[in-house]
Regions:
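Loop-to-helix entry region of an early transmembrane alpha helix in multi-pass inner-membrane enzymes
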Residues: 40-45, 54-74, 91-94, 106-110, ...
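Transmembrane helical bundles and short interhelical boundary loops of multi-pass, membrane-embedded
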Residues: 166, 172-176, 180-207, 211, ...
């Protein structure tokens, strides 16, 4: 993912917001006004650290995104290992997540989303490993730590934490009501004896206190230990994300359209020759993301009919972070908000492709097809590749993609 990451050598898309904010953090004394106060500081601090290490240029701006993109792939592997208990399907899920194109593109631009994604996926992996354990305390604490770091990059990192809170609260309520399935099985998503020693104070420590402490700690370098400064920073983030009027955008889209890839985001479109352009379009690989939709329907059927825990977890961590956008008052949306759900969709595909008596080759055949789709999209995924206008137009299959 690092190859050609320094192209273009200028800012593109939202780098114009985040790199100057990261530069400001390197000043001996933080000047006023603070740039980009609408997001928490951690991702910008990581970009600032990279600028200090590699210089104030394209490599310094974008290297941490590449690193966290690679870590996201590792985190998908850990999620797959938790779900399928075998390395083969976990590797397949990681490859499909990479080939979905969104993760690759988002890793090569100095934006905040890839950092929140990586921390969030590590949190989900820890939660899913703990989900099947009698004593999930350590795994759940690690999940809370990771979710605190995700939220410290972007508040959308809280969505996966909210999913975990809802899952644990629902299971505890059902246990309190002494709910039982008449034909209960070990593979059920709910069991009366799940987590016998996990108390309410453990829940509060893992999913409230620990994430909050980790999150607030990232503000200390900017605001010190001033309670008023920390509170004002949170008020500003909330205000800017919920009440500030934001004009429309050429590539904005509504959340119901994201799974269908109706409206991509053109990050870059530069003419570099007589018939050569450098383009970066966040679109998603249709081979992967359209195929994921029937796969999710099969997961839903299996959860309802057979109560499978793996199907339940896939559905929870796909739909939770995705549908959370439907509840927010913010009207300006972009396809890259779908990145966490799109990445997690790879696990739904692996679940379905190895389900029942499916031949082993079927999963790897799909990985190969996904790879072919990714390769075909490379001219619009990486600016250093370049392409002709004819090829670009051919890749824009629908009018809404232009």
């Amino acid at each position: 993912m690092l190859v050609g990451v320094t192209t273009p050598e200028k800012f593109y898309f939202d780098e114009v917001h985040y790199v100057p904010a990261a530069r400001q953090m390197l000043e001996p004394v933080m000047p006023n006004p603070v740039l980009n106060p609408m997001h928490p500081p951690l991702a910008k601090q990581l970009i600032a650290l990279s600028i200090r290490s590699f210089g104030d240029g394209p490599l310094g701006w974008r290297y941490p995104g590449v690193l966290f993109g690679a870590l996201s792939i590792v985190a998908v592997y850990l999620c797959g290992l938790a779900l399928f208990a075998k390395p083969g399907p976990a590797v397949a899920a990681s490859l499909i997540a990479f080939f979905n194109q969104m993760l690759f593109v988002q890793s090569r631009i100095a934006m905040l989303d890839i950092f929140a994604l990586a921390f969030g996926l590590f949190g989900i992996a820890a939660f899913m490993h703990g989900f099947r354990q009698a004593r999930p305390h350590l795994a759940f604490a690690l999940a809370g730590l990771a979710f605190g770091l995700a939220a410290a990059c972007k508040w959308s990192g809280l969505f996966a934490l909210a999913v975990c809170i809802v899952i644990v609260a629902a299971i505890r309520l059902m246990q309190g009501w002494r709910t039982q399935f008449a034909d209960g099985r070990d593979g059920d998503w709910y069991r009366p004896g799940l987590w016998p020693d996990f108390r309410y104070y453990h829940f509060a420590a893992c999913f409230v206190l620990l994430p909050a402490v980790v999150y607030l700690a990232t503000f200390v370098p900017l605001h010190g230990l001033s309670a008023s400064g920390l509170v004002e920073a949170q008020r500003r983030i909330f205000s800017d994300n919920t009440t500030t009027a934001i004009a429309g955008h050429t590539y904005m889209s509504a959340w119901p359209s994201w799974p269908l890839l109706v409206r991509p985001v053109w990050y870059l479109f530069d003419k570099i020759g007589d018939d050569r352009i450098a383009a970066v379009v966040l679109l998603g690989n249709p081979v992967v993301l359209w195929a994921a939709l029937p796969a999710l329907a099969i997961c839903l059927r299996d959860w309802i009919v057979t109560r499978r825990a793996d199907a339940f977890l896939v559905l929870a961590f796909y739909f939770g972070p995705y549908l959370a956008w439907a509840l927010l008052p913010r009207t300006l949306g972009f396809l890259y908000y779908y990145l966490p759900a799109a990445t997690f969709a790879s696990l739904a595909l692996v679940y379905v492709l190895r389900r029942g008596n499916s031949p082993r080759w079927l999963l790897w055949a799909f990985v190969a097809v996904a790879c072919a789709g990714f390769a075909a999209m490379l001219p619009i995924s990486a600016a250093f590749v370049g392409t002709s206008m004819e090829t670009f137009v051919r890749l824009m299959l629908f009018q809404s993609w232009i």
